[in-house]
């Protein structure tokens, strides 16, 4: 077969391990071997993990709402259908400090599933320099606490 289809109604959404952000791993559900792609739906006040990748680029595309993305010390504000490419080594975090939901498509190379609950302390420090639950200053800083 030369293609696969995942209907929106069939996509499996789940909250992320650390920050509770709803996401669906499109690439995994479509059995992609050379591509990583997820949709992330951030409610007002939510943020993804502040993290880095040592070898892979990531493309961030805002599909709905206003996209807010911190890359190292810069904060980007992106309109729907705008995109940002983040290079390897840069620390990045999407967050939502607006009053409406934001939907992101994040595309990159396939990465092994990163289970932050089972990582060594050294790996956690390398990938998540502020810890896997760090909130951006725009959301008050500190750590995310599950409800």
Kindly give the residue locations of the regions a language model identified.
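Ligand-binding loop in jelly-roll beta-barrel domains
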Residues: 31, 68, 88-115
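Short acidic-glycine-tyrosine-enriched beta hairpin
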Residues: 73-89
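Glycine- and acidic-residue-biased ligand/ion/polar-headgroup-sensing regions
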Residues: 55-57, 61-67
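Conserved short histidine dyad/triad with adjacent acidic residue
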Residues: 23-25, 38-53
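A short, N-terminal "cap"/entry segment at the start of jelly-roll beta-barrel domains
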Residues: 1-34, 119-147
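Conserved hydrophobic/aromatic positions in well-ordered beta-strands
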Residues: 38-40, 60, 95, 105
